Amino acid sequence: MKSSSVAPRLKQERQDDCKFQEGDVNSLELRLGISSDNDQISGGGAASPWLGVGVHPWSLAARQGKAALEQAHQRPNECAVQRENRAASSAQLVGWPPVRAFRKNLSTPKPADADDLMNKVKLCSDEGHGSRCAAQERRSSSTMFVKVNLEGYAVGRKIDLKAHRSYDSLSQALQSMFHGFLSDGIATRDNELQQMEEGSKKRYVLVYEDNEGDRMLVGDVPWELFIASVKRLYIAQDPRVHAKLR
């Protein structure tokens, strides 16, 4: 009788030990929820660790990680922004020691007549022989001396065309310059011409050479155009005098 009563008692003690060990393991279990001392509910069963929170911790952590990734993508990379700013600032530095680009432009002023010079060079290349360039240079200068040659004489003179404003003024100046040459007292090689003139003054015409190398009669074009194209003056004898000799 004693042995039959001892066996159920040992079996009951073993079951109690197993339940006690399971309770210790549950108390030491790691939990992601909010900790609570009331882990046991009435009825002797272990309460679920998620009942006090109401949200599964793994889903909450997933949402938090997703939000952090979205913020990281939307936020600009500070290192990249710093590198771009540093590259932009270094690109604006010129020379050594570093000088800002706009300050370097101020320190090296552009010549005022650079555009005019480029226009003159372009005109010279377009014309080929540079006639228009020479004409522009003569207009811009304050003086314009050209050679004057009298037909039949090897020695010539020079006259400043800028000192005159009309053909009349130029004609009077040439007459005063060549007064001795144009008078009857000068000996010439053409004795027959002197006899036909019978002491009267010889008749001369004023001719000029233009920028194309042609000889033209003075007075056909306006004075400004004449100044722009003349290169040399010639005082030639009137061809009508030679016609009379024939």
Curated annotation (Swiss-Prot):
Extract the signal peptide range.
none
State the residue spans of region: Disordered: 1-22
On induction, the UniProt comment says: Not induced by auxin.
Q: Which UniProt keywords apply?
A: Auxin signaling pathway, Nucleus, Repressor, Transcription, Transcription regulation
Motif EAR-like (transcriptional repression): where in chain: 28-32
Pfam families per UniProt: AUX_IAA
InterPro entries per record:
AUX/IAA_dom, AUX_IAA, PB1-like
Q: Does the keyword Membrane apply?
A: no
In this protein, which residues make up the domain named PB1? 143-238
Q: Name one GO cellular component term.
A: nucleus
Q: In terms of one coarse class, where is the protein primarily found?
A: nucleus
Gene Ontology biological-process entries: auxin-activated signaling pathway; regulation of DNA-templated transcription
The similarity annotation says:
Belongs to the Aux/IAA family.
Role: Aux/IAA proteins are short-lived transcriptional factors that function as repressors of early auxin response genes at low auxin concentrations.
Q: How does it assemble?
A: Homodimers and heterodimers.
Q: What is this protein called?
A: Auxin-responsive protein IAA25
List the taxonomic lineage: Eukaryota, Viridiplantae, Streptophyta, Embryophyta, Tracheophyta
Q: Which gene encodes it?
A: IAA25
